């Protein structure tokens, strides 16, 4: 839990001229802004209606940025010059209003919200990466981590290094009931529990979805509207379908990617949430590299990641190039070059 104890505000006198000032939008700029980055005003004032206009989003972003900076300065025991900060903030506001700069999309959506100030700043991250090489002992936690990040709007990269490191097991299905909490954490925990059942033979209770708010209900923290419990229930069912006939078999790279893609399919159902993922496999793993040749699974969930492979300088690319020519993937990542 994070708590801001020091606020930063731009004055009403400064903001007033911008309320009626024309914004230099392009043909689709305003529509895109209102669709993707404009938050409901009742998040900040229970009596307000409608959603932010650009001047209000700029206010939220700039005040959030400087409040975060102010907290950091005081945390380090440094000197805070409010007059200097106000001058810089006003210049930043004017430049943002006139589209001379913008923060990342995550910043436009999340900066200055109670979610970032009181819960986690992870919602500001653009991307993250998680290796599956320690899948044999971390199990479902790895995919829970990915799901949590995706639900925060973070793009997630992952690899297939965990392939062959564990054997799928029969879960211990119990008659206990788990009422899934109506929160991001509740959804993630249920998936973690189910996957550990198949990865470690752990106990899996019956899931009760009754506490999850109905479709269309407002989400006050992250923003947007609820998709209801249907996408989560479908994810549980899809994961069971994926693993139930593989008990006794080693987990494959395809299983790893399918699991993440099914999670991404669930996350994308959540209105304002996006699901961007990048998978990286071995250059000689044909089953992985041909995953998107299956149209039925591609349209169901395998669209959920861009699939690339670890390319080796000097290798024969003929087969891979033919695959890329056919469907645009796989992508090529030269890690040796990226690290230098």
Question: Where are each of the predicted segments found?
Answer:
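Extended catalytic cores of very large enzyme megasubunits
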Residues: 1-340
């Amino acid at each position: 839990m994070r708590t801001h104890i020091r606020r930063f505000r731009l004055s009403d006198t400064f903001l007033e001229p911008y309320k009626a000032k024309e914004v230099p939008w392009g043909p689709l700029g305003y529509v895109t802004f209102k669709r993707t980055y404009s938050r409901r005003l009742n998040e900040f004032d229970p009596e307000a209606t409608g959603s932010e206009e650009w001047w209000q989003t700029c206010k939220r972003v700039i005040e959030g940025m400087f409040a975060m900076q102010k907290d950091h300065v005081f945390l380090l025991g440094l000197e805070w010059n409010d007059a200097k900060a106000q001058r810089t903030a006003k210049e930043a506001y004017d430049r943002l209003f006139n589209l001379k700069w913008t923060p990342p999309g995550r910043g436009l959506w999340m900066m200055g919200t109670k979610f970032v100030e009181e819960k986690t700043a992870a919602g500001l991250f653009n991307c993250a990466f998680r290796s599956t090489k320690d899948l044999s002992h971390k199990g479902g936690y790895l995919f829970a981590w990915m799901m949590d990040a995706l639900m925060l709007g973070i793009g997630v990269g992952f690899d297939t290094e965990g392939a062959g490191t564990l054997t799928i097991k029969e879960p211990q299905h119990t008659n206990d009931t788990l009422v899934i909490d109506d929160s991001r954490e509740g959804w993630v925990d249920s998936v973690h529990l189910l996957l550990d059942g198949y990865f470690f033979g752990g106990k899996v209770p019956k899931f009760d979805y009754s506490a999850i708010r109905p479709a269309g209900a407002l989400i006050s923290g992250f923003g947007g509207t609820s998709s209801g419990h249907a996408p989560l229930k479908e994810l549980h069912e899809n994961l069971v379908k994926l693993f139930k006939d593989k008990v006794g078999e080693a987990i494959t790279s395809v299983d790893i990617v399918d699991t993440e893609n099914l999670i991404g399919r669930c996350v994308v159902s959540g209105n304002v949430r996006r699901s961007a993922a990048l998978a990286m496999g071995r250059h000689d793993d044909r089953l992985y590299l041909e995953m998107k040749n299956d149209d039925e699974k591609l349209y169901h969930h395998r669209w959920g990641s861009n699939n690339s492979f670890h390319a080796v300088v000097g290798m024969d690319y003929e087969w891979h190039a033919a695959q890329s020519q056919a469907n645009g993937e796989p992508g090529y990542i030269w890690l040796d070059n990226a690290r230098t």
